[in-house]
Amino acid sequence: MAEISKENEDNFIFKMKVLYNQMIHIPSMFSTLKTEFPLFFETDTTNIIHLPMTLQSKIIQKPTRGYCSKFIKMLTQTLERLDKEVNESILEKFLEIISPITPHQNDDGGDNNQSEDKTEYCWKSYYIQNKWITLKNENAYNLVGMTTWGAAYQLSDFILSNQNLFINKNILELGSGTGLVGIILDFIKPLKKVILTDYSPKVLKNLKFNMELNNLEIQDFINDDDDDNNNNVNKENDDKINQVRVLDWEIEDLNILNNYSGLNDSNIILGADIVYEPSLCKYLVSILYFLLERNENSVAYISSTIRNQSTFSIFQKELNLKNLTVIDITKQFEQSSPTSPFIYDRSQIVLYKIYLEKK
C-alpha cells in the first residue's frame, strides 16, 4: 500500500491551492495534479481518505461560487472513482454553494443592502515570495480594467526578475486596472514613488480596494481636482509611496499633465494590456512621448497581448511617428526569467522597451 509523506501531502495541497486560486480550468487542474502527484490518485492508497477535511479548511473558499461548485463536483467524482467515501462536510459545502443566492448577496458573499451592487466578482490569489496576494475581479468581461489580463502577469514577472531596475525610482503605471502591477512593485525596496492611474471611476474604486485589501497604504487623488493646488500640496507632504489617481489619455493639450504632481518625475513608465482600442493609440503614444521627453534617461516597459494585429500595427506606427526607440525584449526576458508564480498563456504577449534617443 502506497505511503505518502507529510511533506508530499503539503506539496500536493499547496499546488492545488495555487491552481485553484488562479481559477485554472478544473479538468486541467486535476490532470496536472495527477501527473505531478500520481500516488494521490491510486486506488490502493488510503491517504486520499483524510484529504477532504484538509481541502475543506484550506482550499474550498472563493474565487467564485460557480468555480467552487465545479471543483467539488470533480473532487467527489475522483473520490468515487477511487471507491472512497465522500466526506460529509464536502457534501454540505456543495449543497450550500448550489443553493439559490439571496437577493441581497453577491458572489463575494457580501451584503448588498447598502451598495446595491449586483455585479458578480471573482477573487484570484497568487503566492509570491512567501506571501499570498488577492485581487478582486469582475466575473464578466464588461469593463477592461476590472479584469487581470495576461500582459499584467508578464509585466509582473519582468518586475520580479529585474528588481534592480526599479530600486529608488519614480514609477508611473498607465491603465493600472485591478492593481496587480502596483502590488508587485511593493515587493521592491526601496522605491521613491509609485503612481497608479486609470480613468473609469469603477476601475479606480476597485484598484484602491485591491491595494488596501493587500495592506498597501495609498494617497487617494481619485476625487481631487488637478488644479486644487492647496489640496495637492498637502497630499504631497504625505510620506506614502503609492498614489492612485485619474488620468484621461484623450487630452489635446498635454501641458495639462504638468498639473499632475509627480508625473513628470517618472523614471519608469509601465503599461499592461493598454493597447486594445485603435482610437486610443495616438493619445497613448503622445503621453508616452511627453513623459519620456521630460525626464532624461526615462524608459517605458509596455506589455501587450496581440489580439488584433491591425490595432497593434497602429500603435507601432504612432511610435514610429514620434521617433521613439522601440526594442522587443520578449525573448530576452523569457530566456532569463525564473519560474513564474502566475499561470497564463504567453504565446501572444510581447514586451516592449521604449525610450527617446538623446539628440
From Swiss-Prot:
InterPro entries linked to this entry: Methyltransf_16, SAM-dependent_MTases_sf
CDD domains: AdoMet_MTases
UniProt GO MF annotations: protein methyltransferase activity
Pfam families listed in its UniProt record: Methyltransf_16
Domain of life: Eukaryota
Protein's UniProt name: Putative uncharacterized protein DDB_G0277003
Organism: Dictyostelium discoideum
